[in-house]
Amino acid sequence: MIALSIAGFDNSGGAGTLADIRTFKHFGIYGVAVITALAVQNTQKVYEVFPIPPDVVKEELKAIFEDFPIKGVKIGMLANKEIAEVVYETLKSKKTNFIVLDPVFRSKSGRELLSEEGVEFLKSEFIKIVDLITPNVPEAEILCGEEIKSLEDVKNCAQKIYSLGAKSVLIKGGHLKGNYAIDILYDGKSFYEFKAPKIAGKTPRGTGCVYSSAILANYLRHKDLIKAIKTAKDFITEAIKNSKKLGKGYEIMDF
């Protein structure tokens, strides 16, 4: 099976399309990519972000869909509204089994990675073609417009994000206080909880990229979202635990 990563290119390899495709491969899925931006970065910080011209992104998408039977799509960094619109218009007309959106608003070092106009377009239109959206707590706060301090807040926010049009919402709770990272899935009917201990002293980059890609890969394998998230949760927990300090800054998950 073939999955498509639509995301930024991180030249340090810790996040973005390189991390997505490594994750796909780990689970036996062949990965192809459409690059939305070049992020000049290392393990310490993002130095600069160069969005790919929207017309080029459109041609990348055309080349992939003309040739490959894409079974699932994972979307990460979109950079700006113009790129988001190109991706939206293309995916709206294609038949894929599953679309996962891991909304990327800021880098781990605090750099803006999606314009305000892009965020508004994501909320008003883009989210409607998404099967699963996987924000962390800060991203979820932007999407639902409310502060999140507890699991009850997470559930309320998940319902609000669902009402924007996503078919299911997974809010990652790693930013909340406590010894456990508790993620909440809402599918419009029920809430599901996925829990794992936080790994002290480990703060690798690319966790959102790898987690969402692992969910997509396992959904394509089993067609069971609950099972896919559970498998991905176990995998990301081990990947964080085994992450390595390859540079001078944040760890990298080397699996």
Curated annotation (Swiss-Prot):
Its EC number is 2.7.1.49, 2.7.4.7. It is an enzyme of class 2 (transferase). It catalyses: 4-amino-5-hydroxymethyl-2-methylpyrimidine + ATP = 4-amino-2-methyl-5-(phosphooxymethyl)pyrimidine + ADP + H(+); 4-amino-2-methyl-5-(phosphooxymethyl)pyrimidine + ATP = 4-amino-2-methyl-5-(diphosphooxymethyl)pyrimidine + ADP. One of its GO terms (cellular component) is cytosol. Keywords: ATP-binding, Kinase, Nucleotide-binding, Thiamine biosynthesis, Transferase. GO terms for molecular function: ATP binding; hydroxymethylpyrimidine kinase activity; phosphomethylpyrimidine kinase activity. 4-amino-5-hydroxymethyl-2-methylpyrimidine binds at residue 41. It holds the Pfam family Phos_pyr_kin. One of its GO terms (biological process) is thiamine biosynthetic process. InterPro entries: HMP/HMP-P_kinase_dom, PM/HMP-P_kinase-1, Ribokinase-like. PANTHER family: HYDROXYMETHYLPYRIMIDINE_PHOSPHOMETHYLPYRIMIDINE KINASE THI20-RELATED, PHOSPHOMETHYLPYRIMIDINE KINASE. This is Hydroxymethylpyrimidine/phosphomethylpyrimidine kinase. It comes from Aquifex aeolicus (strain VF5). The gene is thiD.
